[in-house]
Amino acid sequence: MPRIAGLLETSLYVAEMAPAKAFFVDVLGLKPMLSTERLTALDAGRQGVLLLFLEGASDADMPGPNGTVPGHDGSGPVHMAFAIEAEDYDKWKARLAQREIPLRSEVAWPRGGHSLYFEDPDGHLIELATPGLWPNY
């Protein structure tokens, strides 16, 4: 059986692009790779890409010169986790406090990992997790 090499893209659907982009760039430090009115692609590390789509702007098929991207959209808050180093946990906690981003929760996992939970401007639940969360992380 062929093997999956990793998760490449994760999509979030946002009400307004500017505050969403500012949050992920200014607060979390992700680097923009592409930015249009309907889409922002951010470098999420280790070949990972976070795609921010303006709500309703990607629900129709998008024909292009090299093929058609099927339409997609989502609604409601979703959850995503970013991997962080254990030694950066307190630095991230301080950075969120400095930016006045309230923590929803902190969790100490049985395998030794720790997580910080907070929300982005669209109410999506964001997690920063250290190693020790899953058998493979």
Residue spans for each PLM region:
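N-terminal beta-strand motif that seeds the catalytic metal site of vicinal oxygen chelate
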Residues: 1-18, 79-80, 132-137
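Vicinal oxygen chelate
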Residues: 3, 93-137
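Short glycine-enriched loop/turn motifs at secondary-structure junctions
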Residues: 4-6, 73-77, 109-110
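Short hydrophobic/aromatic beta-strand micro-patches
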Residues: 13, 81-85, 119
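Amphipathic alpha-helical segments
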Residues: 16-31
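Short amphipathic alpha-helices within nucleic acid-binding modules
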Residues: 23, 88-95
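Short secondary-structure junctions
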Residues: 29-34, 103-106
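Conserved short beta-strand elements that form part of the metal-binding/catalytic scaffold
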Residues: 33-74, 125-132
